């Protein structure tokens, strides 16, 4: 098996799965991090199969961990180029699992944290077929050169005390999405730093359960 296709996953409570949830971790972590959220949300999403891929690259600022792209240079145009270079590998991971489960983009939910949000939002905006929905925790939006998808609803969740990725990035993302008339919501959580808490998970669950398939 391709090394990129080896990752932790959790089957849906009900079979066959009707939705695929793709969890995208932050820089320096790996897929085992966000898969740890599944026990807290699985029962509220009984038809969802969860996968948590590892970042495409080894983390280049520490001897352990993974990354979706390097953050050595944080210039937006450099980051956009790095994401564009790696995005096809993430798409391959998702497409293979979709084929295994007989699902498509319209059945797929993207959930990212921090750097995972950055690549998850980018991935969402370049799709020809929209995802079911996308959720971004504590991240930022790096615009692609071309936006193909304006139909996937997006939920942004951010701690007001975040010192890693400031909450201003949520507002920047919201402004960008508003200009494109993309349906989205933003949630600033009080007393929360760069993390995911129970409030954020509840918002995410409610968002998923109120979304409808884009025709």
Curated annotation (Swiss-Prot):
Enzyme class: hydrolase
Active site per UniProt: 114, 162, 194
Pfam assignment, any one: Abhydrolase_2
Molecular function GO terms recorded: hydrolase activity
Catalytic activity, EC: 3.1.-.-
Hydrolase as UniProt keyword: yes
Keywords associated with the record: Hydrolase
Similarity-based family: Belongs to the AB hydrolase superfamily. AB hydrolase 2 family.
Name of the featured protein: Uncharacterized hydrolase RF_1189
Lineage: Bacteria, Pseudomonadati, Pseudomonadota, Alphaproteobacteria, Rickettsiales
